[in-house]
Swiss-Prot record:
Function: Cleaves peptides in various proteins in a process that requires ATP hydrolysis. Has a chymotrypsin-like activity. Plays a major role in the degradation of misfolded proteins.
Gene source species: Lactiplantibacillus plantarum (strain ATCC BAA-793 / NCIMB 8826 / WCFS1)
Protein name, UniProt field: ATP-dependent Clp protease proteolytic subunit
Entry's Gene Ontology molecular function annotations: ATP-dependent peptidase activity; ATPase binding; serine-type endopeptidase activity
Entry EC no(s): 3.4.21.92
């Protein structure tokens, strides 16, 4: 694991050392990086709730660089983003794949961004099953329900039809930042801290 950098700040009361993520949190920045799983989701949710309770009138900035991950963990973040009063700006840097693409597109409308060389990947959910035929059938039905739910969210976020999403997520569908903007998954491309 990569060591977490420490930032030292001077104040009238002396020095204070923060890990970089705690320092960014002071500026209402949350980093969603790496695979989405329950522990990561709980940390992201806690930060969203904390920042919203602190000042629900200010935006929260969610930076995303993730290959995706567990759908239920991602949907917990998605539900929290929609539950809180604060606007959530999403900024894709690097990759927002699979469940991360759902979160990237779920930021507050007009405040969904990507950096110029970012990629967004949309596809159908994957999963596996073993055991008796009835158990495999139950898992297959659950994957189909999940696909329907995810495609509905992506359709709502992008303005595309569910039918188009069903077709476009049949296989891995990689989108550049510009293609993601044209598709409606993001609103703008951010370059040099400006919108393109």
């Amino acid at each position: 694991m990569y060591p977490v950098p420490t930032v030292i700040e001077q104040s009238s009361r002396g020095e204070r050392a923060y890990d970089i993520y705690s320092r960014l949190l002071k500026d209402r920045i949350i980093m969603l990086s790496g695979p989405i799983e329950d522990n990561m989701a709980n940390a992201i949710i806690a930060q969203l709730l904390f920042l919203d309770a602190q000042d629900s009138g200010k935006d929260i900035y969610l930076y995303i660089n993730s290959p995706g991950g567990v759908v239920t963990a991602g949907l917990a973040i998605y539900d929290t983003m929609n539950f809180i009063k604060s606007d959530v700006q999403t900024i894709v840097m690097g990759m927002a794949a699979s469940m991360a693409s759902v979160l990237a597109s779920s930021g507050t409308k007009g405040k969904r961004f990507a950096l110029p060389n970012s990629e967004i990947l949309i596809h159908q959910p994957s999963g596996g099953a073993q055991g008796q035929q009835t158990e495999i059938e139950i898992v297959a039905e659950e994957i189909l329900k999940t696909r329907k739910k995810i495609n509905q969210i992506l359709a709502d976020n992008s303005g595309q039809s569910v039918e188009k999403l069903n077709h476009d997520t049949e296989r891995d569908n990689y989108l550049s930042a510009q293609e993601a903007k044209d598709y409606g998954l993001i609103d703008d491309i951010m370059e040099n801290n400006k919108l393109k």
